[in-house]
Amino acid sequence: MGRFIFVSFGLLVVFLSLSGTGADCPFDWSSFRQYCYRVFKQLKTWEDAERFCSEQVKGARLVSIESYREAVFVAQLLSENIKATKSHVWIGLSVENKGQQCSSKWSDGSSVSYENLVKPFSKKCFVLKKESEFHKWFNVYCGQQHLFMCKFLRPR
């Protein structure tokens, strides 16, 4: 009887510790609010990283960052997973040229409601840099190869 209680208590502790921290996300993905996130340490161009994300899980795209709190979560997750001192990580932000005007948008189609740009954009794709502790957005050429992070809406 004592062993049953011990095992039951252990399972309860595991269940409670997992709830809200990735329990509803696939293995190796992390949870924040209603989304799942994963850092990939493969070098890819922006376009190849975006395609790779979409092949991992239905609805996955390069990460979009929609608030300061989400930016802090993303920076923390990247810092935990990437130890190299000079790393760049693709995010889903890109610039579209429409004639004389440029507009930025997330690869998942959402509008840019939160910005943390270092300087105005002259190139078309964006990364987070380790040197800024993954807090600032830098624009770089889309054909460069970098690490990347994917995000998708967690199933209910």
Curated annotation (Swiss-Prot):
<feature type="disulfide bond">
    <location>
        <begin position="25"/>
        <end position="36"/>
    </location>
</feature>
<dbReference type="GO" id="GO:0044477">
    <property type="term" value="P:venom-mediated suppression of platelet aggregation"/>
</dbReference>
<dbReference type="Pfam" id="PF00059">
    <property type="entry name" value="Lectin_C"/>
</dbReference>
<protein>
    <recommendedName>
        <fullName>Snaclec jerdonibitin subunit alpha</fullName>
    </recommendedName>
</protein>
<keyword id="KW-1199">Hemostasis impairing toxin</keyword>
<comment type="function">
    <text>Snaclec that dose-dependently inhibits platelet aggregation induced by ristocetin or low-dose thrombin, but not by high-dose thrombin. Binds to GPIbalpha (GP1BA). In vivo, also dose-dependently induces thrombocytopenia of mice and platelet counts remains at very low level even after 18 hours intravenous injection.</text>
</comment>
<comment type="similarity">
    <text>Belongs to the snaclec family.</text>
</comment>
<feature type="signal peptide">
    <location>
        <begin position="1"/>
        <end position="23"/>
    </location>
</feature>
<feature type="disulfide bond">
    <location>
        <begin position="53"/>
        <end position="150"/>
    </location>
</feature>
<keyword id="KW-0800">Toxin</keyword>
<feature type="domain" description="C-type lectin">
    <location>
        <begin position="32"/>
        <end position="151"/>
    </location>
</feature>
<feature type="disulfide bond">
    <location>
        <begin position="125"/>
        <end position="142"/>
    </location>
</feature>
<dbReference type="GO" id="GO:0090729">
    <property type="term" value="F:toxin activity"/>
</dbReference>
<dbReference type="InterPro" id="IPR018378">
    <property type="entry name" value="C-type_lectin_CS"/>
</dbReference>
<dbReference type="GO" id="GO:0044218">
    <property type="term" value="C:other organism cell membrane"/>
</dbReference>
<dbReference type="InterPro" id="IPR050976">
    <property type="entry name" value="Snaclec"/>
</dbReference>
<keyword id="KW-0964">Secreted</keyword>
<dbReference type="InterPro" id="IPR016186">
    <property type="entry name" value="C-type_lectin-like/link_sf"/>
</dbReference>
<dbReference type="GO" id="GO:0005576">
    <property type="term" value="C:extracellular region"/>
</dbReference>
<comment type="subunit">
    <text>Heterodimer of subunits alpha and beta; disulfide-linked.</text>
</comment>
<keyword id="KW-0732">Signal</keyword>
<dbReference type="InterPro" id="IPR001304">
    <property type="entry name" value="C-type_lectin-like"/>
</dbReference>
<keyword id="KW-1015">Disulfide bond</keyword>
<keyword id="KW-1201">Platelet aggregation inhibiting toxin</keyword>
<dbReference type="InterPro" id="IPR016187">
    <property type="entry name" value="CTDL_fold"/>
</dbReference>
